[in-house]
Amino acid sequence: MVYAPPSRDGPPIKPAEEEESPGRHPRTADGETTSRSPGDAAIASAFDQIAPVYDRLNRVLSLGRDGRWRRAAVEASGIGPGDAVIDVAAGTGKLAGALADRVGPFGRVLAVDLSPGMVARGAAATSDLVQCEFVVGDAALLPSEDDQFDAATIAFGLRVLPDRAGAMRELRRVVRPGGRVVCLEPTMPRPRWWGRIYEASVHRLAPLAGTATGRRDAYNRLHALVTTVPDANELIELMRASGLVEVRHRGLWLGAVSLCVGTVPA
């Protein structure tokens, strides 16, 4: 999902308790379909609109750092040749492609995104990677049975989701015991003085990026759908509340981005 600037507005994350048709609905593990909520439909529509300029928008809004952040996420996943990985909120497939390179032709990468437009672009971009499959799907109802993957990743998608706690539980559910869940997400930087400078700078840059890519209206619509980002401690607590253990945090870009890794208990 697209990198969007943090905001201090809105409620914090609360820990939880223990090429297809564009009209396709998210699948369950049994192949059945489930209808989208109005919120899901709005998010999918907004991402469909920015899909043609998604990668350029990410580069501008991250000031060119998004590639190195994805590489850090791949390293943190701990995967190797022959492993199976699920990438949720996969967008146009930049992270999925990097994961596919790591697992090789005998591995598997399942890339899931709510936006048919993103899925179409991701599938086209990775068409030469036999180990990579793109599907339209809901992060809160992943199209997989339990314990099917060696790792799960989500990059810049969590804050867009209506049910973030449910999505984190799903990521944990589909990963085998001992496997890792990797979350790469914008977080409010600390110290607060840097957070205020960063927030003001990126909020000024974001409308310019939308204009430069020819999708200002679509970007503004998407940004209006996005709720607050957590600080790093809230993100860590969200992962722990899902049942993950050994949760580790690494701050990137002076804390404006957090890379969190948790392990599914044996």
Kindly give the residue locations of the regions a language model identified:
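C-terminal alpha-helical "lid/dimerization" subdomain adjacent to the S-adenosyl-L-methionine
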Residues: 41, 184-240, 248
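A short acidic, Gly/Pro-enriched loop at the edge of an enzyme's catalytic core
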Residues: 140-152
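Core SAM-dependent methyltransferase catalytic element
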Residues: 242-266
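A short glycine-rich, Lys/Arg-flanked "PGG" loop and its adjoining helix->strand segment in the class I
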Residues: 165-177
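A short SAM/SAH-binding and catalytic strip from SAM-dependent methyltransferases
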Residues: 150-164
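Short glycine-dipeptide loop
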Residues: 81, 105-106, 175-180
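Conserved alpha-helix/loop element of class I SAM-dependent methyltransferases that forms part
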Residues: 63-81, 98
